[in-house]
Protein backbone atom coordinates (compact mmCIF):
# COMPACT_ATOMS: atom_id res chain seq x y z
CA UNK A 1 0.00 0.00 0.00
CA UNK A 2 1.41 3.35 -1.05
CA UNK A 3 1.84 5.91 1.70
CA UNK A 4 0.53 9.37 0.82
CA UNK A 5 2.38 12.31 2.31
CA UNK A 6 0.54 15.23 3.89
CA UNK A 7 1.85 17.51 1.17
CA UNK A 8 0.59 15.36 -1.72
CA UNK A 9 -2.70 14.79 0.12
CA UNK A 10 -3.18 18.57 0.40
CA UNK A 11 -2.31 19.02 -3.27
CA UNK A 12 -4.80 16.33 -4.28
CA UNK A 13 -7.45 18.02 -2.16
CA UNK A 14 -6.86 21.41 -3.85
CA UNK A 15 -6.76 19.80 -7.29
CA UNK A 16 -10.04 18.01 -6.61
CA UNK A 17 -11.65 21.09 -5.03
CA UNK A 18 -11.12 23.20 -8.15
CA UNK A 19 -12.39 20.47 -10.48
CA UNK A 20 -15.51 19.77 -8.42
CA UNK A 21 -16.24 23.48 -7.91
CA UNK A 22 -15.82 24.11 -11.64
CA UNK A 23 -18.11 21.23 -12.57
CA UNK A 24 -20.80 22.24 -10.08
CA UNK A 25 -20.65 25.94 -11.01
CA UNK A 26 -20.82 24.97 -14.70
CA UNK A 27 -23.95 22.89 -14.11
CA UNK A 28 -25.53 25.76 -12.16
CA UNK A 29 -24.66 28.16 -15.01
CA UNK A 30 -26.45 25.91 -17.53
CA UNK A 31 -29.55 25.76 -15.30
CA UNK A 32 -29.52 29.53 -14.74
CA UNK A 33 -29.03 30.12 -18.46
CA UNK A 34 -32.07 28.01 -19.26
CA UNK A 35 -34.11 29.88 -16.66
CA UNK A 36 -32.93 33.20 -18.09
CA UNK A 37 -33.79 32.17 -21.64
CA UNK A 38 -37.22 30.74 -20.89
CA UNK A 39 -38.66 31.97 -17.60
CA UNK A 40 -37.05 35.27 -16.79
CA UNK A 41 -38.26 37.10 -19.91
CA UNK A 42 -41.80 36.98 -18.55
CA UNK A 43 -41.02 38.78 -15.28
CA UNK A 44 -38.28 41.38 -15.91
CA UNK A 45 -37.38 43.88 -18.66
CA UNK A 46 -35.12 42.80 -21.55
CA UNK A 47 -32.10 44.78 -20.27
CA UNK A 48 -32.35 42.95 -16.95
CA UNK A 49 -32.43 39.60 -18.76
CA UNK A 50 -29.30 40.67 -20.66
CA UNK A 51 -27.50 41.55 -17.39
CA UNK A 52 -28.53 38.18 -15.94
CA UNK A 53 -27.24 36.36 -19.03
CA UNK A 54 -23.93 38.25 -18.72
CA UNK A 55 -23.64 36.89 -15.19
CA UNK A 56 -24.37 33.38 -16.47
CA UNK A 57 -21.77 33.69 -19.27
CA UNK A 58 -19.04 34.85 -16.91
CA UNK A 59 -19.95 32.15 -14.42
CA UNK A 60 -19.55 29.53 -17.16
CA UNK A 61 -16.26 30.98 -18.42
CA UNK A 62 -14.82 30.91 -14.93
CA UNK A 63 -16.25 27.50 -14.07
CA UNK A 64 -14.21 26.30 -17.05
CA UNK A 65 -11.23 28.28 -15.73
CA UNK A 66 -11.60 26.44 -12.41
CA UNK A 67 -11.60 23.11 -14.26
CA UNK A 68 -8.45 24.18 -16.11
CA UNK A 69 -6.84 25.26 -12.84
CA UNK A 70 -7.59 21.89 -11.27
CA UNK A 71 -6.34 19.94 -14.28
CA UNK A 72 -3.04 21.83 -14.50
CA UNK A 73 -2.53 22.11 -10.72
CA UNK A 74 0.06 19.32 -10.40
CA UNK A 75 2.09 20.61 -13.35
CA UNK A 76 2.49 24.27 -12.41
CA UNK A 77 3.49 26.55 -9.56
CA UNK A 78 0.80 25.56 -7.09
CA UNK A 79 0.79 28.64 -4.88
CA UNK A 80 -0.19 30.84 -7.83
CA UNK A 81 -2.63 28.23 -9.14
CA UNK A 82 -4.32 28.16 -5.71
CA UNK A 83 -4.59 31.95 -5.71
CA UNK A 84 -6.01 31.88 -9.26
CA UNK A 85 -8.66 29.32 -8.32
CA UNK A 86 -9.73 31.28 -5.26
CA UNK A 87 -9.89 34.50 -7.29
CA UNK A 88 -12.08 32.80 -9.91
CA UNK A 89 -14.50 31.69 -7.18
CA UNK A 90 -14.52 35.16 -5.59
CA UNK A 91 -15.14 36.66 -9.03
CA UNK A 92 -18.11 34.39 -9.65
CA UNK A 93 -19.61 35.30 -6.29
CA UNK A 94 -19.08 39.05 -6.67
CA UNK A 95 -19.59 39.54 -10.41
CA UNK A 96 -22.20 36.96 -11.35
CA UNK A 97 -23.78 36.95 -7.89
CA UNK A 98 -24.32 40.71 -7.93
CA UNK A 99 -25.97 40.51 -11.36
CA UNK A 100 -28.25 37.74 -10.07
CA UNK A 101 -29.14 39.89 -7.05
CA UNK A 102 -29.91 42.88 -9.29
CA UNK A 103 -32.19 40.66 -11.37
CA UNK A 104 -33.92 39.33 -8.25
CA UNK A 105 -34.45 42.92 -7.09
CA UNK A 106 -36.07 43.84 -10.41
CA UNK A 107 -38.26 40.71 -10.32
CA UNK A 108 -39.38 41.47 -6.76
CA UNK A 109 -39.74 45.16 -7.60
CA UNK A 110 -37.60 46.15 -4.64
CA UNK A 111 -34.97 48.86 -4.63
CA UNK A 112 -33.12 47.26 -1.71
CA UNK A 113 -31.02 45.07 -4.04
CA UNK A 114 -30.12 47.88 -6.47
CA UNK A 115 -26.90 48.56 -4.57
CA UNK A 116 -25.61 45.07 -5.40
CA UNK A 117 -24.25 46.53 -8.64
CA UNK A 118 -21.59 48.36 -6.65
CA UNK A 119 -19.65 45.12 -6.14
CA UNK A 120 -19.86 43.90 -9.75
CA UNK A 121 -16.58 45.61 -10.80
CA UNK A 122 -14.78 44.01 -7.84
CA UNK A 123 -15.73 40.63 -9.26
CA UNK A 124 -14.35 41.70 -12.63
CA UNK A 125 -11.06 42.67 -10.99
CA UNK A 126 -10.95 39.26 -9.26
CA UNK A 127 -11.46 37.56 -12.64
CA UNK A 128 -8.62 39.54 -14.24
CA UNK A 129 -6.30 38.87 -11.31
CA UNK A 130 -7.21 35.17 -11.44
CA UNK A 131 -6.22 34.93 -15.09
CA UNK A 132 -2.95 36.74 -14.39
CA UNK A 133 -2.13 34.37 -11.52
CA UNK A 134 -3.00 31.39 -13.72
CA UNK A 135 -0.60 32.76 -16.34
CA UNK A 136 2.13 33.13 -13.71
CA UNK A 137 1.44 29.64 -12.38
CA UNK A 138 1.88 28.20 -15.87
CA UNK A 139 5.04 30.21 -16.57
CA UNK A 140 6.82 29.22 -13.39
CA UNK A 141 8.37 25.77 -13.74
CA UNK A 142 8.25 24.67 -10.10
CA UNK A 143 5.36 22.35 -9.25
CA UNK A 144 5.52 22.53 -5.46
CA UNK A 145 5.16 25.57 -3.24
Regions found by a protein language model. Give the residues of each.
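Polytopic transmembrane helical bundles with strong interfacial aromatic enrichment
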Residues: 2-145
Amino acid sequence: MKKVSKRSSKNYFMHRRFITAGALLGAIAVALGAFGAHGLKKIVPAETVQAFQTGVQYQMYHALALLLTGLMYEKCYQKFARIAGVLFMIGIILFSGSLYLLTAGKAAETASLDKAGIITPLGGVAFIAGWLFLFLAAMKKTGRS
